[in-house]
């Protein structure tokens, strides 16, 4: 929808994204969301006392205290105990949804300032044993379940997420070569942007423990900028014989968090905040679960229609790179301009910590739009189960 009130982003930060089992593996989703939230509050000069609501997205609920996640984030960063909090889950769209939910609170005048965010520790996803709470028979073989792996299959259609991407490859005639070439581009674009310092304004450095002692993590850990086409071509398809999806052209399993603080126009004036961007509108759509990766197509189209804008108006476009064939299917369907889409690399390079990605994409668009002097940008993601979500922002510089 197009917003009923002026809603502005006054701070947007994210942690570096950690590789699976990497530097962030010992931090809970709550820890990482706290790091991002503290950085956002500081960057936006937002006093915790002015925050009216906390909305944090999280998918896997991987820590023992995850049921308290958003509440604990708020309390840890000094937001008053009287301020409510909610943890939400729209799978891969949860980071975006936190912003959408925050906008809805502001538009309904339930809140004036909202701390939004998304966080995920895929490294901490637990193993579990089901159906033993009420006893087991002698000799029973207990099945240990990897919740991370099983969660990547949509049981309603009995289909792993990667197969939904393979379905799009067939439908849109996308080749393995196309996918590997796009994956290489994602890695190369990330390296160029990172070397130029384009991620600096969005980054919330994290102090981590290593064998060499404590160090400050300021750079994403997952990217492999030295990747070559030859290396990508040698990787075997993961889910389908002669398929297109490999470990090299799919988004990386990773850890990370982001925080975006939004405020009404009245709050911006009252607290003398510096608006970085205006939230123009958003749209959420369902789609066929067997091709869930096409979700950004109806989501972006819907957001543009609701706001009276077109793709030509967009200076930057971000489509979360769940899988290379998924992204390429969206690019084909919308006839996206590659020169302004995922300009600094995406999840194939950076990793895709589920709920963290929407917050990362939003934070990146805010700062990159300002760096380039552009006006409009749209961020989007496909969502497991068959949905898509998109948010349009406008540069206020």
Curated annotation (Swiss-Prot):
<keyword id="KW-0378">Hydrolase</keyword>
<protein>
    <recommendedName>
        <fullName>3-ketoacyl-CoA thiolase, mitochondrial</fullName>
        <ecNumber>2.3.1.16</ecNumber>
        <ecNumber>2.3.1.9</ecNumber>
        <ecNumber>3.1.2.-</ecNumber>
        <ecNumber>3.1.2.1</ecNumber>
        <ecNumber>3.1.2.2</ecNumber>
    </recommendedName>
</protein>
<dbReference type="InterPro" id="IPR020616">
    <property type="entry name" value="Thiolase_N"/>
</dbReference>
<feature type="modified residue" description="Phosphothreonine">
    <location>
        <position position="119"/>
    </location>
</feature>
<feature type="modified residue" description="N6-acetyllysine">
    <location>
        <position position="269"/>
    </location>
</feature>
<comment type="pathway">
    <text>Lipid metabolism; fatty acid beta-oxidation.</text>
</comment>
<feature type="binding site">
    <location>
        <position position="227"/>
    </location>
    <ligand>
        <name>CoA</name>
    </ligand>
</feature>
<comment type="function">
    <text>In the production of energy from fats, this is one of the enzymes that catalyzes the last step of the mitochondrial beta-oxidation pathway, an aerobic process breaking down fatty acids into acetyl-CoA. Using free coenzyme A/CoA, catalyzes the thiolytic cleavage of medium- to long-chain unbranched 3-oxoacyl-CoAs into acetyl-CoA and a fatty acyl-CoA shortened by two carbon atoms. Also catalyzes the condensation of two acetyl-CoA molecules into acetoacetyl-CoA and could be involved in the production of ketone bodies. Also displays hydrolase activity on various fatty acyl-CoAs.</text>
</comment>
<feature type="modified residue" description="Phosphothreonine">
    <location>
        <position position="136"/>
    </location>
</feature>
<keyword id="KW-0496">Mitochondrion</keyword>
<feature type="modified residue" description="N6-succinyllysine; alternate">
    <location>
        <position position="137"/>
    </location>
</feature>
<dbReference type="InterPro" id="IPR020610">
    <property type="entry name" value="Thiolase_AS"/>
</dbReference>
<feature type="modified residue" description="Phosphoserine">
    <location>
        <position position="333"/>
    </location>
</feature>
<feature type="modified residue" description="Phosphoserine">
    <location>
        <position position="121"/>
    </location>
</feature>
<dbReference type="InterPro" id="IPR020613">
    <property type="entry name" value="Thiolase_CS"/>
</dbReference>
<feature type="modified residue" description="N6-succinyllysine; alternate">
    <location>
        <position position="171"/>
    </location>
</feature>
<dbReference type="GO" id="GO:0047617">
    <property type="term" value="F:fatty acyl-CoA hydrolase activity"/>
</dbReference>
<feature type="modified residue" description="N6-succinyllysine; alternate">
    <location>
        <position position="312"/>
    </location>
</feature>
<keyword id="KW-0597">Phosphoprotein</keyword>
<feature type="modified residue" description="N6-acetyllysine; alternate">
    <location>
        <position position="25"/>
    </location>
</feature>
<keyword id="KW-0808">Transferase</keyword>
<feature type="modified residue" description="N6-acetyllysine; alternate">
    <location>
        <position position="234"/>
    </location>
</feature>
<dbReference type="Pfam" id="PF00108">
    <property type="entry name" value="Thiolase_N"/>
</dbReference>
<dbReference type="GO" id="GO:0006635">
    <property type="term" value="P:fatty acid beta-oxidation"/>
</dbReference>
<dbReference type="InterPro" id="IPR002155">
    <property type="entry name" value="Thiolase"/>
</dbReference>
<feature type="modified residue" description="N6-acetyllysine; alternate">
    <location>
        <position position="143"/>
    </location>
</feature>
<feature type="site" description="Increases nucleophilicity of active site Cys">
    <location>
        <position position="352"/>
    </location>
</feature>
<dbReference type="GO" id="GO:0003988">
    <property type="term" value="F:acetyl-CoA C-acyltransferase activity"/>
</dbReference>
<feature type="modified residue" description="N6-acetyllysine; alternate">
    <location>
        <position position="305"/>
    </location>
</feature>
<feature type="modified residue" description="N6-succinyllysine; alternate">
    <location>
        <position position="143"/>
    </location>
</feature>
<feature type="modified residue" description="N6-succinyllysine; alternate">
    <location>
        <position position="191"/>
    </location>
</feature>
<feature type="modified residue" description="N6-acetyllysine; alternate">
    <location>
        <position position="171"/>
    </location>
</feature>
<dbReference type="GO" id="GO:0003985">
    <property type="term" value="F:acetyl-CoA C-acetyltransferase activity"/>
</dbReference>
<dbReference type="GO" id="GO:1901029">
    <property type="term" value="P:negative regulation of mitochondrial outer membrane permeabilization involved in apoptotic signaling pathway"/>
</dbReference>
<feature type="modified residue" description="N6-acetyllysine; alternate">
    <location>
        <position position="191"/>
    </location>
</feature>
<comment type="similarity">
    <text>Belongs to the thiolase-like superfamily. Thiolase family.</text>
</comment>
<keyword id="KW-0809">Transit peptide</keyword>
<feature type="modified residue" description="N6-acetyllysine; alternate">
    <location>
        <position position="209"/>
    </location>
</feature>
<feature type="modified residue" description="Phosphotyrosine">
    <location>
        <position position="127"/>
    </location>
</feature>
<feature type="modified residue" description="N6-succinyllysine">
    <location>
        <position position="212"/>
    </location>
</feature>
<feature type="transit peptide" description="Mitochondrion; not cleaved">
    <location>
        <begin position="1"/>
        <end position="16"/>
    </location>
</feature>
<keyword id="KW-0007">Acetylation</keyword>
